From Swiss-Prot:
Biological-process GO terms, alphabetical: cytolysis; killing of cells of another organism; programmed cell death
Keywords in alphabetical order: Cell membrane, Cytolysis, Membrane, Transmembrane, Transmembrane helix
Organism listed in the record: Staphylococcus aureus (strain MSSA476)
Protein name: Antiholin-like protein LrgA
Residue spans crossing the bilayer: 12-32, 35-55, 74-94, 98-118
Bilayer topology term: Multi-pass membrane protein
GO CC terms in record: plasma membrane
Protein location: Cell membrane
Gene: lrgA
Keyword Flavoprotein attached: no
Family membership: Belongs to the CidA/LrgA family. LrgA subfamily.
Matching NCBIfam families: PRK04125.1
Keyword NAD carried by entry: no
UniProt function note: Inhibits the expression or activity of extracellular murein hydrolases by interacting, possibly with LrgB, with the holin-like proteins CidA and/or CidB. The LrgAB and CidAB proteins may affect the proton motive force of the membrane. May be involved in programmed cell death (PCD), possibly triggering PCD in response to antibiotics and environmental stresses.
Amino acid sequence: MVVKQQKDASKPAHFFHQVIVIALVLFVSKIIESFMPIPMPGSVIGLVLLFVLLCTGAVKLGEVEKVGTTLTNNIGLLFVPAGISVVNSLGVISQAPFLIIGLIIVSTILLLICTGYVTQIIMKVTSRSKGDKVTKKIKIEEAQAHD
């Protein structure tokens, strides 16, 4: 009697297979980048694409988890080229340091404000869709306190 082994979906894929999956996602994202009318980095498109593939189940977590963890653990090494390009651009930075610092501060504040608003919107939408009992209870208590 021959027993066929079924491939377990939760079993992690071979490391090389995981590298191929991530490389294909990056390749497709670079193709998408070349057709985009606005400049957007291929790596950002790849992150969104991989997220969508994971959410839809087209790619299983086990197919990218080990390589993804390895890349995340060594992310400092991946920023070395960006750091070197900043050092090479010190001449440009030294021409308008206050402008650059101001832009960094303003963009950080805008990012925090936008993140807060988006978080509030998401929390409202999810509480409405689930019919959150805690939210209803708080609203009832607030209404009684005002009466």
